[in-house]
Amino acid sequence: MKRFGFLYEKVVSVDNCRLAILNASQNKRKRKMVKDVCDNLEDYAKDLSERLSRMDFLSPYKTRFIKDGLSGKERELQIPAFYPDQCAHHAIMQVLKPIIERSSYHWSCANIPKRGIDHASKGVERATVRDRKHAKYCVKMDISKFYPSIPHGKLKARLREKIKDEKFLQIIFKVIDSHEQGLPIGNYTSPWLAELYLQPLDNLIKQKHRIRHYVRYADDLVLIDSNKRKLRKALHDIFEFVGELGLSIKHDYQLFRIQQYCKDRSGRRGRKIDFVGRCFGVGFTTIRKRRASALMRQSRFIQKLQRENRPIAYRIASGFISRCACFKHTNSYAMRKKYCETVNIKKLKEVISNESKRKCLSQLAHH
């Protein structure tokens, strides 16, 4: 395995720090602190470089609790200060990112840019739509409390396998040790370090067990193959390997036959793969019931507002258009026709356009 060196000089360079501040400030430049830093970019870039050199770039986290989307799960966020914390995280990751991306599995999604829900969905549809012959059985599992459970010692050992620059390692170790246990949800570095930590698991599944189709979305794993015995054996080894990583698989893991139409037209047998908000069967993809219900409610509400000529909020308009876009990637023609096409999308786009213009004018006024 190739180990990388001469990274410390890249991280602490003023050019890298300047770029890190600009990247960290994206979509935040209305905030007073961010505006002050950007207005004095050169001074702060030099200061950040010095802080990284003397390992003085961390301050206490602010804790915040949120409810995560439609799932309703409560999550604890650790929010770092913009300067110097977030800027330092970007400076570190600008150097570390290419190393992690270089060895990442193609169907490892969520933690890497341009590999979101649609990319994960394509990975599953490679099996269920394009390779139906081998899309017979599925293993679906989830790592329990993934971010908070990652052991610092084993993560540091994993970093040492990839990097030989001791000074750079001390900087990244300081970020890891800034949180008592696991990786904090909210740090820019956390998803990238989590991706690096699970890369050996991806290699085990694809190279040792040669599972025909495997997709991972953060800590959710889907394995698809025509051989049930092979999946059982892989499942056993995954449990052992994940245990060695200091993690654990949730008890509700499943091994089941994938839903498909029967040739005698007696209906369907098997179950759909419920993954990334969509349900996959052999030859078709639909939206998860909870997401479909949310779209139906929002569609009726918007239709009522449009009938009464009442104004529609930007948040509602943008959310509905986003939900409708999800239906384009699924076999949900009847629902799209009933709930999306009955809404005046042109009016919603006008609301979004007007809000964008208002934001642009507001930014110009500030300058």
Predicted regions: what they are:
Residues Q86, H90, S178, R232-F239, ...:
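Right-hand nucleic-acid polymerase module
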Residues R51, E125-A218, V222-D237, R257-I258, ...:
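Conserved polymerase palm-domain catalytic core
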Residues R51-K73, C87, K164-S178:
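Reverse-transcriptase-like RNA-dependent polymerase core
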Residues M1-K46, L364-H367:
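Non-catalytic, polymerase-adjacent accessory regions of viral genome-replication enzymes
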Residues A110-A120, V222-I224, L255-D264:
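Beta-rich nucleic-acid/ligand-interaction surfaces
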Residues E74-Y105, E180-K206:
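Conserved pre-motif C helix in the palm subdomain of viral-like polymerases
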Residues R3-Y8, H89, M93-P151:
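Active-site-proximal segment of RNA-dependent polymerases
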Residues D36-L52, D68-G69, A194:
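N-terminal accessory alpha/beta regions
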